[in-house]
Amino acid sequence: MIHRGLWLHNLVQSYRVGSSSSSSTLFKLVYRYNSSTSLAKSSLKQSCELSCKSNTEPSNMDWDKLGFKLMPTDYVYSMKCSNEGNFEQGRLELHGNIELSPAAAVLNYGQGIFEGTKAYRKEDGSLLLFRPDQNGVRMRIGAERMCMPSPSVDQFVDAVKQTAIANRRWVPPSGKGSLYIRPLLMGTGAVLGVAPAPQYTFLAYASPVGNYFKEGLAPLRLYVEDEFDRASPGGTGFVKTIGNYSRCLAALSRAKNKGFSDVLFLDSVHKKYVEELSSCNIFIVQGNQISTPAANGTILSGVTRSSIIEIARDHGFKVEERKIAVDELMEAEEVFCTGTAVGVASVGSITYHNKRVEFKTGSQSVSQKFYSTLIGIQTGVVEDKKGWIVEID
């Protein structure tokens, strides 16, 4: 192996002799060499830190008081996309801020999508993922809609696995919560006019979380929004683009200021049909029939949503995906919400046009039955007969 100093000396001498070579080219080559050397050292350092940290529980951590707030962990997974549209080998980096051009497409034109999945700890300490491949498929669908290249499903799942393993000490004990993993795909290349970015970055970071809503497992209080809408036909409501969530903030803030847990949006055309909440899907129960709004292009086809549809049918319920008028919603026996962040959450009341209606909740409710089955599968307590669980350790 050539000594680093001798290699640089020979490189400089060769460029001094060659008159056709520019100093900028020399700088780029030396910079690349220094960068690759630093990268190797950094990777070695991170590997050492990873092996030391991975099994050491964070100090002063009260797992019983976890909410749904960002708690930075140790590592972030990063993967760059070349100009040819191929994603390079990803790597783990220490958690920290990232640098972006002020002209990055994600900042100027919102060219970005994200996913959400969770890692759970079994009683024996091993880690489980719940259907991460479905999140990978959905990211690819979203990327196509947003004119972005996307990692393959295998690359996506591998990134989630690596993120979970690297941050395993932050996975709460069984029954205390989960490690929420946020994969993010964004146009990081600089553009001035409206156009797809020239470069893209995939990231995955993690945070230990408990219940999404401040109510914990208590029934939710929802407010039906009939002024603002979340999505419109032909738009991006069916993908997890970042703009879908920022447009919910005004309505959500208004509802929370009135003491509600979340806001329920109606369709943008008729202002009559139920769509979804700011962060999750909705179901209604009437006897042995369960209904949820059809995924027709304006709502997100949630991974938890599709799982609950299967679980409900396994429990003998008839499940329909169809249009649900808000008047029918208000006459339901039971209402509940589903999502990766929220799990399965029962709805205690809904307010629409100053009319408040209460719904069945409690240990005998349908939603509680589904919640117990779902969380049981996710944590390894209930047998997974569907191949949904990926055990990674």
UniProtKB/Swiss-Prot annotation:
**Catalytic residues (positions):** K240 (proton acceptor)
Tell me one Pfam family matched here: Aminotran_4
- Output the superkingdom of the source species: Eukaryota
Q: Which biological process annotations from GO are given for this protein?
A: isoleucine biosynthetic process; L-leucine biosynthetic process; L-valine biosynthetic process
Q: Where is the transit peptide?
A: 1-34
Q: Which GO terms describe its molecular function?
A: L-isoleucine-2-oxoglutarate transaminase activity; L-leucine-2-oxoglutarate transaminase activity; L-valine-2-oxoglutarate transaminase activity
Question: Hey, what tissues is this thing expressed in?
Answer: Expressed specifically in lupulin glands.
Additional detail: Branched-chain amino acids are synthesized in chloroplasts, whereas the degradation takes place in mitochondria.
Q: What is this protein called?
A: Branched-chain amino acid aminotransferase 1, mitochondrial
